[in-house]
Amino acid sequence: MPIKIPNTLVEELVRLGMLVMKDAKLYENLARKEDKELGQILIEKDVVSANDLLEIKSRLYHLPIVRVEEIQLNSDILKEISEEVVDFYKVAPFKKEGNVLKVAILNPEDVDALEALKFIASDKSLKIEKHVIDYRDFEAVQRNYRSLTEEVGKALELLSEEAG
């Protein structure tokens, strides 16, 4: 999937004086070349700190922040969004309260990710509550998601062997 450049975020960083448009274009090209999110590039190049970027995203998109230490993945959450969707769209469910699914999202401007969440919500009769998350925390959630998916898979294998 091609990297989606968050134009509203770029404009906000320029407005705040943290980035000049000429450099923004260079970083956008680098993000595409390295197949990384623009925010990751900006953090790696010390344009903005991870924490400042997260705070700016939260304020800009009017979304709460979620941190990895607040996330307790369990097998029920895995049923809501597949690992493939998590990896492809950079969204991760982290809590379900009634019919509200709380989801961490890296790029709230990614229309494809938002459409995927809308589809999932409609398909499962859920409401989606989006939260922004930083890159390091998202990677930790992905790792936990992967290991939990593997554990559930192994448990299902054992059950089918015992039943068979």
Where are each of the predicted segments found?
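N-terminal, intrinsically disordered, highly charged
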Residues: 2-164
